[in-house]
């Protein structure tokens, strides 16, 4: 399995706008974490950006996971980039 880094941005007023979708989002993340796919994910201080690390077979798998997330579908995340990552330490 390869590791991938996710970096993205939140919409303005994300803390308020995410409220109706937060439970679905967190439930899905918990499932991905239990399955060993999600290593970590969370906002930067101020909730302007999101950072995550995933473990998956391919880049396209992670991109599909992002596309299926309610935060992406509802515009809470406004831009997401996923990069293959080589963990040195």
Give the residues covered by each predicted segment:
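Conserved, structured core segments of small domains
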Residues: 1-89
């Amino acid at each position: 399995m390869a590791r991938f880094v996710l970096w993205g941005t939140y919409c303005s007023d994300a803390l308020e706008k995410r409220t109706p979708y937060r439970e679905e989002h967190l439930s899905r993340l918990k499932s991905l974490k239990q399955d060993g796919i999600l290593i970590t994910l969370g906002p930067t201080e101020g909730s302007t950006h999101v950072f995550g690390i995933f473990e998956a077979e391919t880049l396209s798998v992670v991109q599909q996971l992002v596309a299926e997330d309610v935060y992406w579908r509802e515009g809470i995340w406004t831009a997401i980039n996923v990069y293959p990552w080589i963990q040195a330490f």
